[in-house]
Amino acid sequence: MHLLPLTVSATAVVSAASSPHAKRAAIDECLKNAKVPVTARNSTEWKTDASPFNDRLPYTPAAIAKPATVEHIQAAVLCAAEVGVKANPKSGGHSYASFGLGGEDGHLVVELDRMYNVTLDPETHIATVQPGARLGHIATVLYEEGKRAFSHGTCPGVGVGGHSLHGGFGFSSHSHGLAVDWITSADVVLANGSLVTASETENPDLFWALRGAGSNFGIVASFRFKTFAAPPNVTSYEINLPWTNSSNVVKGWGALQEWLLNGGMPEEMNMRVLGNAFQTQLQGLYHGNASALKTAIQPLLALLDANLSSVQEHDWMEGFRHYAYSGEIDITDPGYDQSETFYSKSLVTSALPPDVLERVAEYWIETANKVRRSWYIIIDMYGGPNSAVTRVPPGAGSYAFRDPERHLFLYELYDRSFGPYPDDGFAFLDGWVHAFTGGLDSSDWGMYINYADPGLDRAEAQEVYYRQNLDRLRRIKQQLDPTELFYYPQAVEPAEV
């Protein structure tokens, strides 16, 4: 454990009952005295740093620290503790619930996107990654320096911090697992300002907690990831599905889940269903060449009575770019401010029994397809006997969804509005989720915090995000952060003592 080699002090201790204005003044003075760089209020930079990814959920921070060093992070945490404001790390700022801004007004935001260095050890192939690096920058550096990679999502602007600490699924996950599975150690600033290393051998309880619920226990100042050799070829593909009526949805989905459960999807294949009101497709990225893809996918095509509508072979970075939906990949500019207005929900489920599948299909056709906003549903082929995600032992970290049968599909339900989000919009996705969960045992479904749903209350959110791991997480929270310095509305609660 490394204690901060400096002290910080506000002019006066600010009580918990002090006004927001008094706390802002106190945190400003404390950060100034500690020489922590900050974002000036009412500046253009403040507008960017305080902007949410979800425009539906803007919040006003008490202050924004923009550290350039680990010592700055430590000092910022100590200032928050002394003044009595909650602190939240913000890596890329893509939280669907604006948790990087605190999920409410009045928090200290520790804006990490100025700390984005990535280095690769040429002998061990371990990547050292600062917490503000975005996925596109990481992918670019690892490939350019050594043709290496680790498994992560497809959006280049997403920050590594929240993404990897809470899962991190993408088009290499069926082959290589989640981003969280590639973390070998991390340097973490705790609520008392100390800097500790967490790994299998150092602070193992913290390391376990970080790998699935990391934002609750501290601010990661540096990650170390193992990497794999990027394959020389990957192949993107699309298959149009005739899911235009509920019977076709039931038939096609049923065939797909049987194929997945029975080991038909090889490890090299990564796949999702992408559906909206206008079309439904299977999309994916095969880790191999086009010829190998066509051979591997032929049994599924026969089951679905379908054909490949698109096949493109790429090198690794071209494959990443294909599904990035972004012209820019190597993003390091702190001025990056992509945003949308939306509501989103998630699910992780087992295979769907016939009655649930029929209810979900009916909702899709009769309700969802009549909604004329820009909604979509993504159904990721997540589990099954060949999935690297569910091959990880359940106790390896606090990430909860590792059963190859009970955790077969990962869903993102996303409803975007191009104006103010309508008051009746929430019922649309809530109803769709209920169509799934109404017929499933609670052990057969959960939710994924990287698609956070702010409509859940705190107790429900903790339960569906962490399931069997919640009690242990609460005990570790009590040990490391009993006063909940690292708080947001769905944060893990400390265990009662």
Swiss-Prot record:
Glycans are attached at residues 42, 117, 192, 233, 245, 289, 307. Substrate binds at residues 154, 272, 412, 451. It is an enzyme of class 1 (oxidoreductase). Disulfide bonds join 30-79. InterPro entries: BBE, FAD-bd_PCMH, FAD-bd_PCMH-like_sf, FAD-bd_PCMH_sub2, FAD-linked_Oxidoreductase, Oxid_FAD_bind_N. PROSITE patterns: FAD_PCMH. It catalyses: D-xylobiose + O2 = D-xylobiono-1,5-lactone + H2O2; D-xylotriose + O2 = D-xylotriono-1,5-lactone + H2O2; D-xylotetraose + O2 = D-xylotetraono-1,5-lactone + H2O2. It is found in: Secreted. Its EC number is 1.1.3.-. Its cofactor is FAD. Binds 1 FAD per subunit in a bicovalent manner. Residues 1-16 form the signal peptide. It holds the Pfam family BBE. The FAD cofactor is bound via a bicovalent 6-S-cysteinyl, 8alpha-N1-histidyl FAD linkage. Keywords: Disulfide bond, FAD, Flavoprotein, Glycoprotein, Nucleotide-binding, Oxidoreductase, Secreted, Signal. Gene3D superfamilies: 3.30.465.10, 3.40.462.20. Belongs to the oxygen-dependent FAD-linked oxidoreductase family. This is Xylooligosaccharide oxidase.
